[in-house]
């Protein structure tokens, strides 16, 4: 009974003070009350981080809080470079498998090879290490050496490699290549500090090789720095063209224009987008569509039209707060509605509604209708960029079984073991990627090994869509093998493009004499209807 009255007394005291305490003081009193009275000991950092997270949950979905460590990792990712040794790897059963070596990087100079197995890093065995833990051990300060214990197939003894870390450029361009004698292709994965320079070099190189038309792939590009999006728009639009404008808290508008220093202001341009194309990618796509500069191919983009500004906190953490909404040159808002619990699941909602597979299921109210600035074509705002040419989603490609293979890296070990046994013979038969991509067929037994590994992991192959899934698995394996056999480019994506519906549709448009120009042609004005005079009866 006594305990009840103590609790009640505390509650009554709190209620009596409610009107006297301002909200900020209330927060501090709550923190102190937890510190002084809660049964378990809790650190201040954990409590404050939880309080901040609670406040951020009351804002829009894109305002976020980053701890000091998270902020540092984000800055490194966006800067486009880090100090490391220049390798790609996978971790499988206590072994680190080197899958790719960056040309000219520290690992390449030290003689590390694709196919090597890393057993220990600085005398520490990698047993039990996760991908993230391996990455933390390999990355470090520029100029600081790292010692790797390596097992190489064909060698009786393990070897030690001492490699000096150097800055590695984490390229925002996944790959750039000539599809044929006149069509170039560039896949952009992120908008970072290095994106404009990378794009400049890629365009100059492709033009020197005969490029007259370009496919710019922004599929699954989640955005990045807005300044980089302006820079890429500058590559394709003349000087003083509006890229976008933003409207902030005070309702004032800021306008962002091109500078006129682009490498590809003429020539056919097609942009590939999908349901995961977001943010800075949508700014760029919207500008190119509004100025009738490019044909947009694919599916409606994600719909993120909010601009975040970082607000540093003294301990190194960062609040990334939405400070403005951005609009395309024609005045379209790209942001989809974010009130409600379905925001993060919006892509799945669109899939369930049939919107991703049937263009007739896509509906925009007339209030969201707009027109492009040159040809006066009809476009829509209010929830992403709608493409000029719709390409339905291959639902088998997003089947849960294939997703499990990717998420759990089930294909990686069979592919690596296959290369271990066949690397020399493959390189003897296929001297370069072009011949490999043209003639190589993945053997059926390798596909079956992956199917068996998936079954053992609890992901059996279902009968529905089986043939298509096996075809996609074979293509995925071919891409993996290509990326490990040949260095210097992202050959994985080049292999996958041979069966990408949006890519193939873009090629078809570019091969038609008026394919692109026809879609970008000005809308013909309909003559006014004239009344026919007749005799009154």
Predicted regions and their residues:
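Extended, small/polar residue-biased N-terminal targeting/export presequences
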Residues: 21, 38-99, 145-175, 496-507, ...
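Polar, glycine-rich mid-to-C-terminal structural blocks
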Residues: 280, 292, 299, 303-367
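Bacterial Sec-dependent N-terminal signal peptides
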Residues: 1-23
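Structured segments of extracytoplasmic/periplasmic soluble domains
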Residues: 33-37, 41, 50, 54-58, ...
